[in-house]
Amino acid sequence: MDKFQIQGNGPLKGEIRVSGAKNAALPILCAGLLTADTVTIDNVPNLQDTRTMLKLLRQMGMHAEMTGSTATLKGTDINSPEAPYELVKTMRASILVLGPLVARFGEARVSLPGGCGIGARPVDQHIKGLQAMGAEISIEHGFIHARASRLKGARVVTDMITVTGTENLLMAATLADGETVLENAAREPEVTDLANLLVKMGAKIDGIGTDRLIVQGVDKLHGATHSVVADRIEAGTFLCAAAASLGDLVLRDIPPLILDAVLIKLREAGANIETGDDWIRLSMSQRAQAVSFRTSEYPAFPTDMQAQFMALNAVAEGTARITETIFENRFMHVQELNRLGANITAEGNTAVVTGVPRLSGASVMATDLRASASLVIAGLVADGDTVIDRIYHLDRGYDRMEDKLSAVGAKIRRIA
């Protein structure tokens, strides 16, 4: 099982090109199920999760090829509208095939999902929405069975804001009979990116980027070409690493607007930040100031940046309170950061971080995707060597992280 060995050293300096967003690429790949035509997707990150999704689509009968960062999808021969447990258990986003399959083929059989172990993250909102659109759904032997002769437009009000739920219902609504209104819709840039692709494919969607999406169903969608939006979480992770290491880092191919809440907190921590249309530069001349925050839905502070900012706060001056409102059980990195010398206490959904001048290298274990990233940041600024075990979590969401960090001065390598 691969590990990272990191030798803490000086500041990160240089340039990094930001990859396409995993959380946009996965639903966008699923959108290929909605048409028999060819859909070409550029800027797809080379990740374990994207490879798993392509494998799942191929297993259903889709022609799905990946050349470099371009995926080519053709859904003429889909013959098995099923997502088996063997693939779904490793990736929660597999649930995103449910809406497209029911909408185009009238049936789907999808195993209940797995992925990172950070709380319940139930799929009941997906099911509730599809039932409102006329699908008959049952759950038997760990599988969601859905059937509908044709989905009907409906007004769907989810009980909570759910990104994958919004994406699933949005894709389903594109081929439904009549108008569907999705209230309390997620507004994340990745949802907007999916909606923009669907429009290119012939979908009729109003309210893109808002919490109220109005979809006029069409009889069929056609092929399109699309480029995946930049990964704001990858970008934020590298910015936190640069801030913690007192570095000077330029990120390319990232529109700063989608990272607004993170940039505000980095400035509050003392970072000097410059931006252009598609680049961000962060420089840090002194030890960061501790910053408190509360995670919430976009455009507020993202839960997927909570762990990275905890690592930054661990070496900052002062004390910060971090409140996690999106997922339960998302402080599993606290214990591992404390092994590196951090001073963090967690109770319920709030963690209190008192910064220390230095961390010290140790052997630690990654528990989920973003927790892994926080340990990398901590290792980069710790005295001595840090070894991070179970980095397969990291490979699910970061494209060649060690290569990108090495190019800007980090001493990090993958070991068996």
Curated annotation (Swiss-Prot):
Substrates-to-products reaction catalysed: phosphoenolpyruvate + UDP-N-acetyl-alpha-D-glucosamine = UDP-N-acetyl-3-O-(1-carboxyvinyl)-alpha-D-glucosamine + phosphate
InterPro entries, per the entry: Enolpyruvate_Tfrase_dom, Enolpyruvate_Tfrase_sf, MurA_subfamily, RNA3'P_cycl/enolpyr_Trfase_a/b, UDP_GlcNAc_COvinyl_MurA
Disulfide bonds: none
Alphabetic keyword roster: Cell cycle, Cell division, Cell shape, Cell wall biogenesis/degradation, Cytoplasm, Peptidoglycan synthesis, Pyruvate, Transferase
Modified sites of kind 2-(S-cysteinyl)pyruvic acid O-phosphothioketal: 116
Residues given in the record as phosphoenolpyruvate binding sites: 22-23
Keyword Cell division: yes
UniProt main location, coarse: cytoplasm
Highest taxon of source: Bacteria
Active site as annotated: 116 (proton donor)
EC class (word): transferase
Keyword set includes Oxidoreductase: no
Example GO biological process: cell division
Function comment: Cell wall formation. Adds enolpyruvyl to UDP-N-acetylglucosamine.
Descriptive protein name: UDP-N-acetylglucosamine 1-carboxyvinyltransferase
